Amino acid sequence: MITKIRLQNWKSFKDSTIYIDSLGILIGTNASGKSNVLDAFAFLRAVGDGKSLLDAIQTVRGGEDWIIRRGENTFCIEAEIETEEGNFILDLRVIKKDSGFSYGLCEIHRLGSITEENVPDEFTDSTRNITWKTYNIPSSMDFWSSLYATLRSI
């Protein structure tokens, strides 16, 4: 289950954190960002479904023209995910260059486990245009299945 989501330069959000319980209700005036929060979940789900970075961006209302806050060239979605193996942080950063979205970096680590001494396992998925860095992550398929199931259940 996702227990917290932080949006940086995502659509209309400069830097906002939303805490999530088992029951969540979004309330706000018109144009306050409710749909933009839902778009963030749709984007995470698309990444969890295995879509390429560009395809995941295209699932969001407004596509690449509206996904990053005006005047910025990068956005970040950070989700705290609770699994049977513990709590983890998924930190997804995307950089836009003049030629389009060229780079995604997804870091996954156990909550509170990153130190300067940690060296991540790193691999690049060139078909999806995302580099993955993992820190102290269980290598079991159960963990990865649980993580992707959480993202797909959004």
Locate the predicted segments by residue.
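Hydrophobic anchor at the beta1->P-loop junction of P-loop NTPases
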Residues: 26-28
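Phosphate-binding P-loop
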Residues: 15-21
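Electropositive, glycine-dotted interaction segments
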Residues: 86-154
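N-terminal pre-Walker A segment at the start of P-loop NTPase domains
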Residues: 1-13
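A generic structural motif
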Residues: 8, 80-82, 109
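Conserved lysine of the Walker
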Residues: 34
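Conserved P-loop NTP-binding catalytic core
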Residues: 39-102
